[in-house]
Amino acid sequence: MRTDTPQAVNLADYRPFPFAIETTRLVFDLHPTRTRVSAELSVRRTGGKNEPLVLNGERLKLVSIAIDGRPLAAGEYGVDAERLTIAEAPDAFVLTTEVEIDPSSNKALMGLYMSGGRFCTQCEAEGFRTITYFPDRPDVLSRYSVRIEADGKFPHLLSNGNPVASGSLDGGRHFAEWSDPFPKPSYLFALVAGDLDVLADKFITMSGREVALRVFVDPGQASRAAYALDSLKRAMKWDEEAFGREYDLDLFMIVAVRDFNFGAMENKGLNIFNSSLLLADPQTATDLDYERIEAVVAHEYFHNWTGNRITCRDWFQLCLKEGFTVFRDQGLSADMRGAAVQRIKDVRALRARQFAEDAGPLAHPVRPSSYLKIDNFYTATIYEKGAEIIRMLKAILGAPAFRKGCDLYFQRHDGEATTVEAFIACFAEASGRDLSGFFGWYEQAGTPSVTIETAYDAAAGALTLTLTQSTSPTPGQPDKKPLPIPIAIGLLAADGRVLRDTEIVLLDQAQMTVRWDSIPEPPVLSALRGFSAPVNLSTDARPSDRYVLFGSDTDLFNRWEAGQTLARDLILTRAAGAPDEVGEERYADALGRALVDDAAEPAFKALLLALPSEPDLALMFEAADPAALHAARDHLRTRIAVHLGDLLRRLHGEMQINGEFSSDAAAAGRRALRNACAEALSADPHAENLARLLGHFGAARNMTDMIGGLYPMVAMGGVPREKALESFHHAWRTEPLVLDKWFAVQGRDPNPDALERVIALTQHPDFEPTNPNRLRALVSTFANFNPARFHDPSGAGYAFLADEILKVDAFNPMTAARLVEPLGGWRRYKPELGDLMRAQLERIVAHPNLSKNVLELASKALG
Ligand code: ARG
Ligand code: ZN
């Protein structure tokens, strides 16, 4: 048994920090193994007379400490593994500390570490405390000035704010000084030092100020940063137009690093990115990479207002910046790439990640009230469901009142660290609405289930809708209350004509009825249009109603949704042993008609052609059997490939683009549809299709087509798989981002020998477990996206994942913890599997020296 039970942090225990840190002066003397950091904090007491000054600090070697220049004697302060305490601090003073740290041994990639021979930092959420002693909490805002000294081998010395001085020093060393005029919390501090190439540009803001833009990348990679730089300019413009937000410093910098625990980080004026979300050219990046780069560059830039100018009072308020900022980046993507297609992709991701989380032992409210490690709460719930809540707020208030609320928030809370309550209060005030019930969305975990029953009275020409909602219990929340759910509803006639336009019905009780008159004929219900709320909807619709929606709903989201629901029901029925052959034919016919609709965009058709994923299907199942689902889904794939073979081959040919590559949404849509056709045809691998697929892979001139061709080759197994993987590896062995794709495609390999091969790949010379991208490409792809092989009846897939978690936890707890989730759903699987999953969680929890990160998630998963 472990004796050191970690302490939970509770929202209810929030207390302001009893001191203000008005200015923070940092001097870095950089050295790979012995970096000196001296900090000069001007401290002023704001709380009670007897409050001690307690600063966070971990893994620091304290070299000296002084108050107002006077070194402290041993009895005047205390240091332990997590903090520095000065019991009797004056009311106003300057505290100077000097510490030594070792960036090169830092494989947790938090704080100051080295990547590719360069220094870089990641401080959110609690990394700053491994750099210097400081109140490392988001509500302590300070003005920073930074001096960096380093060897000439590190030519670029970067930090937040504006550059104020630079020059050379003795012994081949040099320095740079930076000053950030905006008070900020420590988690937004950043430093980068090293040899980098830079791509430069400028942006003129709406008030006419010129901002210098710089993107720093590995030497030789500057051309690959052009798309990110262009995305940045579009994001800056969009934020001015959509939210009236202007950039505030004279300089905005982005740096790409290869070793990074997550996507990117919004440090003030100096964003740091995982290189996988920054570098792109047609040869090495897929359209999905381009799409994500556009979204993440925007996301981090948007944080400058939603996160940096207005930050979080404490980490329980994380959704205040993350949910709002995801909402904002989704808005940009919708404007750049088409609202319907973007919405479908966002909802697909929401269901795959957030609905799964909300349905399992790791379910938590968008604003949680307790945690062990805040790093475990950078979840789909905080981010994606957090964004859905803002989207509902906008739907309920209407766009003008929503914008007024945003303006009020920006004006009232600028320069503050605030709360979700304060944010919602701005919308209540701006709209004059009572939003107290709405707040339940932040406090209640779980995905609500909504049912709608319809009764049509032909004589009266009236339709009665009976709407009900309920939410199942989640850990720690046995009883759920009704939430205000905006449900966008329209009506179609049986022949697809519009009978009634979209209207938002606000379901804010457990049950309510709505009566609509003047409905001249029996209607087909199109409910939850645009996925107007993050709920599971069930209605009394018959398959024939769904075919009406699939064929003609004006709401493209619901058109897609109808197709998915039809396919899902057919797969689940077959997996349960009662196949509906006639229904499968009918579905394939309707899909064929949708694919030849000239009015629909290729990107939309590509989405229609993608069947519901296996993990999504498993969510719909009690006691899920991944093998049966895989087989049933494959059966429908084959049925479609056979039934629509001619059409799919024709489209595959027509969508081919000859001529120059364009990364725009229209061209990407054509490539997506062509790849979807290839994927579909691979389910019927006769000679003609095989030749076509080989041609697709062999002739690919960009990475989107290449990956679209590689997966079917891998899925075929045998000689095509070996040959394709070998030629791909040979071509790309020196490009880390492309090699990640090579590992990922093998993580998704559906062949029966995939697990064995994945385990063997962990011994491949190119497998670098200390690099999170490489690790996730193989291990996380396998565990999350290859259910048929991960859920091997022997339990070997689970044991493999547990082995990897324990190995990685020894040096990078944060990345290890993110691998726990696939085991967390054990209760949803059939008991033979669930028991084996649980056994691996028990093995993990029993492991000595487990990190708090993994301990928290694995023990919660055991429930
Ligand atoms: N704030 C960053 C973003 O969303 C992510 C930081 C993740 N930090 C963490 N400890 N998981 O853009
Ligand atoms: Zn963010």
Swiss-Prot record:
The record marks 383 as: Transition state stabilizer. Its cofactor is Zn(2+). GO terms for molecular function: alanyl aminopeptidase activity; metallopeptidase activity; zinc ion binding. InterPro entries: Aminopeptidase_N-like_N, Aminopeptidase_N-like_N_sf, PepN_Ig-like_sf, Peptidase_M1, Peptidase_M1_dom, Peptidase_M1_pepN, Peptidase_M1_pepN_C, Peptidase_M1_pepN_C_sf. It comes from the Bacteria. Binds 1 zinc ion per subunit. The keyword Lipid metabolism does not apply. Transmembrane segments: none annotated. Substrate binds at residues 124, 263-267. It catalyses: Release of an N-terminal amino acid, Xaa-|-Yaa- from a peptide, amide or arylamide. Xaa is preferably Ala, but may be most amino acids including Pro (slow action). When a terminal hydrophobic residue is followed by a prolyl residue, the two may be released as an intact Xaa-Pro dipeptide. The active site is at residue 300. The keyword Protease applies. Coiled coil: none annotated. Keywords: Aminopeptidase, Hydrolase, Metal-binding, Metalloprotease, Protease, Zinc. Belongs to the peptidase M1 family. PANTHER family: PUROMYCIN-SENSITIVE AMINOPEPTIDASE. This is Aminopeptidase N.
